């Protein structure tokens, strides 16, 4: 009698394990991930008709993209943007003496 009860219990345990393993997962994603907007919903402007090369269409870039605002407040650091290639509307970047010295060392090292 003991073996019969043991076999029945074992059969129930095996049935429970197999039913859990063989069933489909209960979690299903809700909605579509990465939904795209319908082009007709957005107004067609000159900017949106241009190809998107990953550049910002904003006239100014937010400071928060580059710096943590909390760190800026505590350090007192106020970044100034400048242009190395001479972009109009930005002051030219001025190299410091140590920057020129480092550039010369790197040029000598790499033979540039």
UniProtKB/Swiss-Prot annotation:
Tissues of expression: Neurons L2-4 and L6, also called giant dorsal LUQ (Left Upper Quadrant) neurons of the abdominal ganglion. Also expressed in smaller neurons in the CNS and in peripheral organs such as the kidney.
PTM characteristics: The prohormone is proteolytically cleaved in 2 steps, yielding first 2 products: luqin and PRMP. In the second step, PRMP is cleaved to yield luqin-B and luqin-C.
A GO cellular component annotation in the UniProt record: extracellular region
InterPro entries: RFamide_neuropeptide_ACEP-1
Entry protein name: Abdominal ganglion neuropeptides L5-67
GO biological process terms on file: neuropeptide signaling pathway
Domain of life: Eukaryota
Organism of derivation: Aplysia californica (California sea hare)
Signal sequence segment: 1-23
Annotated localization: Secreted
Record's keyword terms, sorted: Amidation, Cleavage on pair of basic residues, Neuropeptide, Secreted, Signal
Residue numbers bearing the Phenylalanine amide modification: 33
Top-level taxonomy: Eukaryota, Metazoa, Spiralia, Lophotrochozoa, Mollusca
């Amino acid at each position: 009698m003991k073996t019969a009860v043991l076999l029945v219990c074992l059969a129930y345990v095996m049935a429970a394990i197999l039913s859990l393993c063989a069933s489909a997962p209960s979690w299903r994603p809700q909605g579509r991930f990465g939904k795209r907007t319908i082009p007709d919903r957005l107004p067609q402007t000159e900017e949106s008709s241009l190809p998107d090369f990953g550049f910002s269409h904003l006239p100014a870039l937010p400071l928060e993209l580059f710096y943590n605002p909390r760190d800026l407040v505590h350090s007192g650091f106020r970044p100034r943007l400048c242009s190395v290639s001479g972009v109009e509307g930005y002051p030219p970047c001025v190299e410091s003496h140590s920057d020129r010295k480092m550039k010369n060392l790197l040029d000598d090292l790499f033979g540039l």
